[in-house]
């Protein structure tokens, strides 16, 4: 297996493999906040996110939602289909929290009757600005048809994930998705779905079970990620 590094991000490394069109993702133990300004390492975090993402992507596949995920190959690694990442962060919001609550002057915890889908331009130098469809077209990020596909996929994924997390006694507050194009131009779900990319609250206590415990210094990150993984395993057994 080749060790040629293609890309290193805040939470993962991407490597070539000996198979054309297949890449290896290695999850890191690093946690970042404020767009990478704050950074710490937590032993076992990479393993937890790899397992959680692998289980969720496998579950989505059974529900008819395609992604780049192929299979996990170690505690911290998985194989994925090679895609060209579309530089958009697609955020789906079911409950008021975080930046949306501040932007709209709302209280955290207020339910949103119909999920809000937002788009952010993936550019660290610009601090990932909030953009709309017109900006996407102007920047030549995606076509109108591709945006329709992405928005529909995001809502479908939201429905499936809400049902899954409900079984885990967790409220899916909001989450971030990324998509890519495969060699044939098909739009596929990519990146990861984990407590790094989701805002998750316990249904009974509203305890935060995601990276907010790190952002806000209100808990042990590996403990809450382990709790999410354990609940996920229970509902999938």
Curated annotation (Swiss-Prot):
Organism the protein comes from: Listeria innocua serovar 6a (strain ATCC BAA-680 / CLIP 11262)
Keywords: ATP-binding, Ligase, Nucleotide-binding, Purine biosynthesis
Cysteine-cysteine disulfides: none
GO biological process: 'de novo' IMP biosynthetic process; cobalamin biosynthetic process
Protein name: Phosphoribosylaminoimidazole-succinocarboxamide synthase
Database matches in HAMAP family: SAICAR_synth (MF_00137)
InterPro entries the record matches: SAICAR_synt/ADE2_N, SAICAR_synt_PurC, SAICAR_synth, SAICAR_synthetase, SAICAR_synthetase_CS
Pathway: Purine metabolism; IMP biosynthesis via de novo pathway; 5-amino-1-(5-phospho-D-ribosyl)imidazole-4-carboxamide from 5-amino-1-(5-phospho-D-ribosyl)imidazole-4-carboxylate: step 1/2
Lineage, highest ranks first: Bacteria, Bacillati, Bacillota, Bacilli, Bacillales
Highest taxon above the source species: Bacteria
Gene Ontology molecular functions: ATP binding; phosphoribosylaminoimidazolesuccinocarboxamide synthase activity
Similarity annotation: Belongs to the SAICAR synthetase family.
EC number of this enzyme: 6.3.2.6
């Amino acid at each position: 297996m080749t060790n040629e590094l293609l890309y290193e991000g805040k939470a993962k490394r991407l490597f070539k493999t000996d198979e054309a069109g297949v890449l290896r993702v290695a999850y890191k133990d690093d946690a970042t906040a404020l767009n990478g300004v704050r950074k710490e390492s937590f032993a076992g975090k990479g393993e937890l996110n790899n397992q959680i993402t692998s289980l969720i992507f496998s579950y989505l596949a059974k529900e008819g939602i395609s992604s780049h995920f192929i299979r996990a190959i170690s505690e911290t690694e998985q194989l994925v289909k090679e895609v060209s990442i579309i530089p958009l962060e697609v955020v789906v919001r079911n409950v008021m929290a975080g930046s949306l609550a501040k932007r709209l002057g709302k209280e955290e915890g207020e339910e949103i009757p119909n999920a809000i889908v937002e788009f952010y331009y993936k550019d660290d130098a610009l601090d990932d600005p909030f953009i709309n469809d017109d900006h996407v077209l102007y920047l030549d990020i995606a076509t109108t048809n591709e945006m329709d596909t992405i928005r529909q996929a995001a809502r479908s994924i939201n429905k499936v994930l809400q049902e899954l997390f409900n079984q885990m006694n967790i409220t899916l507050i909001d989450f971030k998705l990324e998509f890519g194009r495969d060699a044939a131009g098909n739009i596929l779900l990519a990146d990861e779905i984990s407590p790094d990319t989701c805002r998750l609250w316990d249904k009974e206590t509203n305890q935060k079970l995601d990276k907010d415990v790190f952002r806000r210094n209100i808990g042990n990150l590996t403990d809450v990620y382990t709790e999410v993984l354990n609940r996920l395993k229970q509902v999938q057994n």
